[in-house]
Amino acid sequence: MACRYPFSPAKVAITRFFYPSPLSRSTTPLFCPPSCRIRVGNTSRMLTSSSSVASEDPKSEMAKFLASPNPKSSASEPGPSPHDVLSAPTSAGHISEAEETLSDQLRNPGSSSSSSPSQSSTNNLSSKNAPFKLSSTYSLPSNISVPPEVREHLIEWSKNVLEHSRYVIQEAQKKFVGLGLKVNEMTGYQEVERLKYMVFEKEDELQRLREHARTAKAAYDEAVAARSEAQRETNILLERKHSWTDADVSKFTSLVRSDHTSSHAVASTSIALKDAEIAVDKSFSQLMQVILQRYHEEQVWSDKIRSVSTWANVAGLAINFIIFVGAVLLVEPWKRKRLVEKLEERVASMMERVDHRLEGVEGHLERVAAGSASASAIKEQHSDAAIQGVEDMPSNSTANPLEFVSPQTIPLMAAVDPTINGSESQSDPFFTQTIRGFPNYLDPLVKPSQKRDLAVAGMAGAVAAWILIGAVRLVRA
């Protein structure tokens, strides 16, 4: 089918991508308007998107045409022009109907609930056959009493909202149409539209010439039949020429006159038939030429759109390449420089903290060295005193040597030699039982010590972890 509605350019551009075949006339474009001209064979008629128009006005010509059983009878009527399109129901009509409905509901809030079930069923049945209408967004319940001032304000507000929405819709439609015209002008689609309308005109002209040729053919056939009938009757009279009467003579004269007239009619109708056939052939050739021109222009337009999209892709790739190069040459060095600066700042702060700590460690080492020197001196003094004491008291040789050391010198000596106070610094082991019967190289594991406690705790943890892993695997299985 071929739609004769002047599409907006944006819809035409989108339809072009969905229907790439330029000569395809068996499909309707994606954004076909509610009113289209449909061609089926040699007939041309106007249809609407729904039967609501015919149901609303059954006496209109459109309703009669749709109700007629033989639509081919209207094929001889001249088709409308490309701009003579049926006016489809617009949104403005629906908005006005919605406005009236809302006003009635606000004025009569209890009317909707006081209707009987039979009336509601009748309304439901009639609403199925009625055309689509915008219903009001809100209906007031019957148990709510609205003051007259509030009701008037609501009615005024609803009217203002509907008028504003109607104005916005109209302005949006105008802007879309203007945008489509600009797109058509920029892309050169106006020439394609002109050729499309020319194709429709040539089709109408070809249809008219074919009707004229059929009429000429019928007249030629009638003239030939009349001449044949006159010749047949003349031959019959000539066969009984010897028995003619006065009536036969007058009849023969009229037959000769009619034969002469029919011969002239046959000659004239044959010439008219030939002219009509030549005109039909010429119109058909012109139609094919216009179709080829339209196909060529559509191909040129498609190539132009394709080239524009190609250059757009190239421009996008170039922009992406520029961004990539800029990121590699400018952004990444700047990020690296900033990262290095931050790293240097952090390293400098860390080095400052390390320097402070090293200064503290050096002071501590100096104090430890001084303490160790004093401890060694005290140890030598006490060792000399101990040797003299041993010589004086040989019976006390088994005594502890630390007994001869004063309590004030023990911390200084422990700082130099940790083994002096090692028994006091270590905690008691958890397992105090000694295992016997093992060789000497297993003494760390046989005798009670912290190392044995740590080894036992590690083995117990390993066994518990192995048991837990096995349980988890069993649960998953």
Curated annotation (Swiss-Prot):
Residues 476-477 are mitochondrial matrix. Residues 332-454 are mitochondrial intermembrane. The chain crosses the membrane at residues 311-331, 455-475. Residues 45-54 have a biased composition (Polar residues). Residues 111-128 have a biased composition (Low complexity). Keywords: Coiled coil, Membrane, Mitochondrion, Mitochondrion inner membrane, Transit peptide, Transmembrane, Transmembrane helix. It is a multi-pass membrane protein. GO terms for biological process: inner mitochondrial membrane organization. Residues 190-233 form a coiled coil. The keyword Manganese does not apply. One of its GO terms (cellular component) is mitochondrial inner membrane. Residues 45-128 are annotated as: Disordered. It comes from the Eukaryota. It is found in: Mitochondrion inner membrane. Its main location: mitochondrion. Homooligomer. Required for the maintenance of the structure of the mitochondrial inner membrane. Involved in mitochondrial morphology. Causes growth arrest when highly overexpressed. Belongs to the SHE9 family. This is Sensitive to high expression protein 9 homolog, mitochondrial. It comes from Cryptococcus neoformans var. neoformans serotype D (strain JEC21 / ATCC MYA-565).
